[in-house]
């Protein structure tokens, strides 16, 4: 195979942070090369340098054997390097074709009017090459995330990309959508396109990757054949340490007092007659397929979505919760599945994010901020949760996903919430950070906190939950103890309503 990209002794630093040190990487034509590492390992920085988002400090990049310097994404696109970010870069109000050729739309003879027929025809041709059935005239905002991702791939291919960088491409996809994405990746691979595949999902490696390069703490560790290397070996290279397993402790949960009881809750089409109890010291797992209503239940209890009927009882007393402020006043915290949108102020620093939900506590004379007290509080939680940051004044956006998630947790711990909803707490974070989050959740339960964990990863649900509640199409279809819960039983309950509907 021909070498498309070769990186040698690459270095990159930001203020106070050494992001890359003497990194090497090679991508061959027609291969899927997985890039693995904990959050903060330097994967994203390396890919952004290859895509022209960042410039290197030193080192060498060869493209087709020739030295190159990408000063902007346009430079990278011009030679055929495309990147598909985890957060899709699309304009929802524009059509599929307009997004694919944005800024390069074909014009009429005078160059003034958009030639929509030619635009749609060119977009259709690219989609046909991918064997994707998608109307070029469809508005992107009306598409599923999976279909939007196909638009991003088509957009990259419109530049005749020979190198395609995919950052966590399956994070928001279901199994059928992942299978379709893999089909397209294999099609591109057969045409000689080199694909850099960044993911934290180990099970995907054996399915799609040819080789794996592992990074740790901004440095190159190893490149291995995916087929010949065990998942355990890759994890060991990623973290540089042995991950201790976290076993549920069921005795406390069985004996704990009821902290939260939800009775016959109705809130929109995805919360229908939902009832459950949550005990102090317990981790209650919520499982189900996408669209089952798990997030909607959490949002309704937290006051983020309106409740039509039902009761919410906190510590034995009926609670009136119409807004998130009401929920917080009753000691309920909610960590959203979209931490960047709903959990963090990414333009602010670490200490401001930690105290922001309880800012009144840090006011003097209801006006002046007690900066020293804020600094002490932030330092306490940075130490308690093991948040890796150069300082409490570091901008949150510069931290890894795992550390950002810990900051959101710190925010609710500072409010001293007794009931905590964790919605997809490990989404988009690496295996080492996941293990730290697991330890933290178990520690919180050990202190008597009542924890709800919503997760789409069944191994995570089975590993962490004292009990498992399963939902399908807005209703609870079953409850399993930790001893009873298996992937097969959970999936049976998660598809029960679909099965009944099909049988009918």
UniProtKB/Swiss-Prot annotation:
InterPro entries associated with the record: AAA+_ATPase, ABC_carbohydrate_import_ATPase, ABC_transporter-like_ATP-bd, ABC_transporter-like_CS, P-loop_NTPase
Subcellular locations according to the entry: Cell inner membrane
Binding annotation for ATP: 37-44
Keywords: ATP-binding, Cell inner membrane, Cell membrane, Membrane, Nucleotide-binding, Repeat, Sugar transport, Translocase, Transport
Protein's membrane topology: Peripheral membrane protein
Reactions catalysed, as given in the entry: D-ribose(out) + ATP + H2O = D-ribose(in) + ADP + phosphate + H(+); D-galactose(out) + ATP + H2O = D-galactose(in) + ADP + phosphate + H(+)
Pfam family, one: ABC_tran
Predominant place of localization: membrane
GO terms assigned for molecular function: ABC-type D-ribose transporter activity; ATP binding; ATP hydrolysis activity
Record-annotated ABC transporter domain positions: 5-242, 241-498
GO cellular component terms, A-Z: plasma membrane
UniProt-listed Enzyme Commission number(s): 7.5.2.11, 7.5.2.7
Keyword Nucleotide-binding listed: yes
Similarity remark: Belongs to the ABC transporter superfamily. Carbohydrate importer 2 (CUT2) (TC 3.A.1.2) family.
General function of this protein: Part of an ABC transporter complex involved in carbohydrate import. Could be involved in ribose, galactose and/or methyl galactoside import. Responsible for energy coupling to the transport system.
Stated name of the protein: Putative ribose/galactose/methyl galactoside import ATP-binding protein
Origin species: Paraburkholderia xenovorans (strain LB400)
């Amino acid at each position: 195979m021909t070498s498309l990209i070769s990186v040698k002794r690459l270095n990159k630093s930001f203020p106070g942070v050494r992001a890359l040190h003497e990194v090497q990487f090679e991508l061959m034509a027609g291969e899927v090369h997985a890039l693995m590492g904990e959050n903060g390992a330097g994967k994203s920085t390396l890919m952004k340098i290859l895509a022209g988002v960042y410039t290197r400090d030193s080192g060498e990049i060869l493209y087709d054997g020739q030295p190159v310097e990408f000063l902007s994404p346009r430079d990278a696109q011009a030679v055929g390097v495309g990147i598909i970010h985890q957060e899709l870069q699309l304009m929802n109000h524009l059509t599929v074709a307009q997004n694919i050729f944005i800024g390069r739309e074909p014009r009429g003879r005078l160059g003034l009017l958009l030639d929509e027929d030619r635009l749609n025809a060119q977009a259709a041709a690219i989609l046909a090459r991918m064997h994707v059935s998608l109307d070029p005239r469809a508005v992107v905002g009306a598409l599923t995330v999976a279909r939007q991702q196909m638009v991003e791939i088509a957009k990259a291919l419109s530049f005749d990309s020979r190198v395609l960088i995919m950052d966590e491409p399956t994070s928001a996809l279901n199994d059928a959508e992942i299978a379709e994405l893999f089909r397209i990746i294999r099609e591109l691979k057969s045409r000689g396109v080199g694909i850099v595949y960044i993911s934290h999902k180990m099970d995907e490696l054996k399915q799609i990757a040819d080789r794996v390069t592992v990074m740790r703490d901004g440095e190159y560790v190893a490149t291995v054949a995916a087929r010949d290397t065990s998942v355990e070996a890759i994890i060991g290279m990623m973290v540089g340490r042995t991950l201790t397993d976290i076993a549920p402790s069921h005795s406390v949960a069985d004996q704990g007092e009821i902290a939260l009881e939800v009775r016959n809750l109705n809130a929109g089409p995805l919360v229908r007659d939902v009832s459950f109890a949550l005990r102090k010291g317990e981790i209650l797992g919520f499982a189900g397929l996408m669209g089952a209503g798990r997030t909607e239940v959490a949002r309704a209890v937290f006051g983020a979505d309106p409740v039509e009927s039902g009761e919410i009882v906190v510590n034995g007393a009926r609670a009136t919760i119409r807004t998130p402020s009401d929920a917080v006043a009753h000691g309920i915290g909610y960590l959203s599945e979209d931490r960047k949108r709903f959990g963090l102020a990414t333009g602010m620093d670490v200490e401001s994010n930690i105290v922001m939900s309880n800012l009144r506590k840090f006011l003097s004379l209801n006006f002046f901020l007690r900066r020293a007290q804020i600094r002490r509080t932030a330092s306490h939680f940075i130490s308690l949760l093991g948040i890796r940051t150069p300082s409490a004044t570091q901008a949150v956006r510069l931290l890894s996903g795992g550390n950002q998630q810990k900051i959101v947790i710190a925010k609710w711990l500072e409010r001293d919430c007794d009931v905590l909803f964790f919605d997809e707490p490990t989404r988009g974070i690496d295996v080492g950070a996941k293990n730290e989050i697991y330890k933290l959740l178990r520690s919180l339960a050990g202190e008597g906190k009542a924890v709800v964990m919503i997760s789409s990863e069944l191994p995570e649900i089975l590993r962490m939950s004292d009990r498992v509640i399963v939902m399908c199409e807005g209703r609870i279809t079953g409850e399993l103890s930790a001893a009873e819960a298996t992937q097969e039983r959970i999936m049976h309950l998660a598809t029960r309503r679909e099965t009944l509907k099909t049988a009918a």
